[in-house]
A protein has these predicted regions:
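Glycine- and acidic-residue-biased ligand/ion/polar-headgroup-sensing regions
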Residues: 57-74, 132-150, 156
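Ligand-binding loop in jelly-roll beta-barrel domains
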Residues: 84-118, 163-191
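A short glycine-rich, His/Asp/Glu-containing loop-to-beta-strand
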Residues: 15-49, 58, 97-129
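Short, structured patches in soluble enzyme cores that scaffold and shape functional sites
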Residues: 28, 44, 65, 73, ...
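Short, well-structured hydrophobic secondary-structure segments
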Residues: 43-44, 48-92
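Alpha-helical membrane-anchoring segments
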Residues: 2, 50-51, 134, 156
Length: 191
């Protein structure tokens, strides 16, 4: 189980130059964009433009901050508005998607899965959960304060794992002003 903190991860410019990404975790560790089995990141989108293409990769996106985006594919297969109330949206990485901003810059959470190698789901979770229940995964605090085995977790902090080792639950700390929320990713190998 590895602890992570978004504030300590340096941003990397996108392949298409329209924003920057902070890679939270990937498998295998240190794998580049052409070799990962799965990858989880947080992106800052500063300008409208096309998404980078990732053939053979299934993607899921969740808006975290900002007024929202509208995703459209030239072939009509995608026409989706996303805001902070929208559940995670899944699409194929080889689909040519254009992104327009519905206001200013936005921040989103991204899950990318190499098709035929990994499958998984991105959800927003509000109650206690147990990291390590799935073969691999990641959780990131989005709102509220959380606690696990006496360690505090604030927004932007979390855990990732690559082997199933259920252990101590991660729980929201009662009494906070924010409604507690986690980005929760559960992953399983397909092969």
């Amino acid at each position: 189980m590895q602890r992570l903190d978004l504030a300590t991860i340096a941003p990397t410019p996108w392949k298409n130059g329209g924003g920057a990404t902070r890679a939270l975790a990937c498998w295998p560790p240190g794998a580049g964009l052409e070799r990962f089995g799965w990858r989880v990141s947080v992106a800052d989108v500063a300008a409208p433009g096309p998404f980078s293409l990732y053939p053979g990769v299934d993607r899921q996106i969740l808006l975290l901050q900002g007024d929202g985006v509208h995703l459209r594919a030239a072939d009509g297969s995608v026409d989706q508005a996303l805001d902070r109330a929208t559940p995670p949206f899944a699409f194929a990485g080889e689909t040519a998607i254009d992104c327009t901003l519905r206001g200013g810059p936005v921040r989103d959470f991204n899950l990318m899965l190499r098709r035929g190698q990994w499958r998984g789901a991105l959800r927003v979770w509000h109650g206690a959960c147990t990291p390590g229940e799935s073969p691999a995964g990641l959780c990131l605090v989005l709102a509220g304060h959380w606690e696990r085995a006496g360690e505090a977790y604030a927004p932007g902090q979390g855990l990732w794992w690559s082997t199933p080792r259920p252990g101590v639950p991660l729980r929201p700390v009662p009494g906070g002003l924010d409604h507690p929320a986690l980005a929760w990713v559960a992953l399983e190998p397909e092969i």
